[in-house]
Regions:
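Dinucleotide-binding Rossmann-like beta1-alpha1 core, especially the glycine-rich loop
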Residues: 1-31
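Alpha-helix/helix-capping structural signal
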Residues: 8, 33, 117-118, 251
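Helical element adjacent to the flavin cofactor pocket in flavoenzyme catalytic cores
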Residues: 11-21, 42-102, 106-110
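C-terminal catalytic lobe of FAD-dependent flavoproteins
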Residues: 19, 27, 60, 156-157, ...
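General small-molecule cofactor/ligand-binding pocket signal
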Residues: 28-30, 77-79, 209
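Mid-domain beta-loop-alpha active-site segment that forms a flexible
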Residues: 51-68, 117-118, 188-195, 245, ...
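Short, conserved active-site loop motifs that form the nucleotide-linked donor/cofactor pocket
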Residues: 75-77, 169, 235
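Active-site substrate-recognition segment that forms the wall
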Residues: 84-95, 105-233
């Protein structure tokens, strides 16, 4: 749902939605009156919305828990609480595993580097540069709004996303460029609730149950890095998805699976070529 306060923005938002029709997206323009008839969570000030009919929402924590259970059910080994310090290589230069901070080496036939903004410092050991800019986003979780929206979406004028999750409402947004490790800017968190207050009922009476900030991995050219590293056999990269990690994660997995197994790719080869690690610098000393 693309929620819109200013009626003057409705036409532009509708045009944006229609421009995605060739990719299979269906949209419906809804007046403010009709929106509130369908869902009482929205304030009278909301002029209308563009409903993306094929969109969906989820609980990220439950999704990851389900994925973890599926991995274990298929014989996978998930290691928690261990830090990857580098890579293990065979005498011929092939990457054969990950070296943990404890000194243990986890070996495998193929190694996938998918460490988000930390992919670049890890790749540096191998002489590879993955130009990455951390872009911090914030979210705040609210309980007790009284009424939750039935759909998730984006508040058009503020670019703040909202997502009902069980009995709680999650608000997320901002794109704070800077190095990792800096203190949080609490005004960013306050801005999320201030934005939601303009669109949704019950924000003032709700209480905060969680606050969080995390780094989105933004590459220098805006494209993710997916595929085999030409100079290091056995090493594959899957990172740089910026704000689209959840959506692009599944297709990244399919691409890497085809790469590793040597099977036919389903994605357009020209588009895939733009994402390949071969465009990265390898001038660092390995």
């Amino acid at each position: 749902m693309d929620l819109i306060l200013d009626e003057r923005n409705l036409d532009a938002a509708q045009h944006e939605g229609r421009s995605l029709a060739r990719y299979g997206y269906r949209t419906d323009r809804i007046s403010g009156t009709e929106l509130r008839r369908r869902d009482p969570a929205y304030r009278d000030e909301v002029a209308g919305a563009i409903h993306y009919l094929d969109s969906a929402i989820l609980h990220p924590g439950l999704l990851l828990r389900g994925l973890a259970n599926a991995v274990r059910a298929h014989g996978g080994d998930m290691r928690l609480g261990c830090e990857v310090a580098g890579f293990a290589r065979a005498s011929d230069g092939r990457c054969i595993g990950a070296r943990l901070r404890s000194g243990e080496v986890m070996e495998g036939g193929s190694v996938v580097l998918a460490a988000g903004v930390w992919s670049d410092p890890l790749a540096a050991e191998l002489g590879i540069a993955v130009p990455m800019q951390p872009a911090r986003g914030y979210h705040v979780q609210l309980e007790g709004t009284g009424v939750l929206p039935r759909h998730g979406g984006v508040m058009h004028e503020t670019f703040v996303a909202y997502n009902p999750m069980g009995s709680q409402l999650r608000l997320a947004g901002t794109l704070e460029i800077g190095p990792t490790g800096r203190p949080w800017m609490r005004k960013r968190l306050h801005a999320l609730t201030a934005a939601a207050r303009r669109y949704l009922h019950g924000i003032d009476r709700a209480h905060v149950t969680a606050e969080w900030a995390g780094y989105r991995p933004c590459t220098a050219d805006g494209m993710p890095v997916i595929g085999p590293v030409p100079t290091i056999p056995g090493l594959f990269i899957g990172t740089g998805h910026a704000m689209m990690g959840l959506m692009l994660g599944p297709v990244t997995g399919r691409i890497l699976c085809a790469d590793i197994c040597g099977s036919q790719q389903e994605i357009d080869p020209d588009l895939l070529d733009c994402m390949r690690p071969k465009r990265l610098r390898t001038s660092r000393a390995a």
